[in-house]
Amino acid sequence: IQQYELTETQLQFTDYPSNNIQQASDKHHPIVCFNQDRHLVCYFALQEHHEFESYTTHSSTLLLRCFSTDTRFLHQGYATAALQELPAFIAEYYPHITSIVLGVNIDNTTAQALYTKCQFKDSGQRVQWRKGTLMIMELVLSK
């Protein structure tokens, strides 16, 4: 995880996995994604009982945070694949969860397009955060 690379542009919106993984707890779950060659290509964390719970009408949500793709593996489909597999992963390991929420920086149009492609919807809500204004997006999971 120490060799994970992010560009300066990526670091405007996210953090290194090595920093985020230190927050791991029974409610903050780091997720690492590997390709077929066993290279770490994507990282994110899923958090229960999070600060964005008030921005959804669903009672059981996970917050998707710190999503990134190692710069050496950008534009190869790994981020899309990881997000498209997420509902099945959550159904298996968190069957009580009914939605996934995230906050994406309003200036990060690349990430917004990715999340939209993967069926996340703009909730219309905006939140002021450490690195700027966040657009709250949500993916409602079918049961």
Regions found by a protein language model. Name each.
Residues 33-34, 135-139:
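Short beta-strand element of the conserved SAM-dependent methyltransferase core
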Residues 80, 106-124:
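Conserved active-site alpha-helix within GNAT-family acetyltransferase domains
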Residues 63, 68, 101-103, 136:
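Conserved beta-strand segments that form the floor/walls of ligand-binding pockets within enzyme
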Residues 77, 94-95, 119:
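Short glycine-rich hinge loops at helix-strand junctions in the catalytic core
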Residues 70-76, 106-107:
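Active-site acidic-Proline motif in GNAT/NAT acetyltransferases
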Residues 2-66, 70-72, 83-84, 89-93, ...:
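Acetyl-CoA-dependent GNAT
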Residues 96-112, 128-133, 140-141:
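Conserved beta-strand-loop-alpha-helix junction that forms the acyl-donor binding cleft
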Residues 47, 101-103, 123:
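Solvent-exposed beta-strand sheet faces enriched in polar/charged residues
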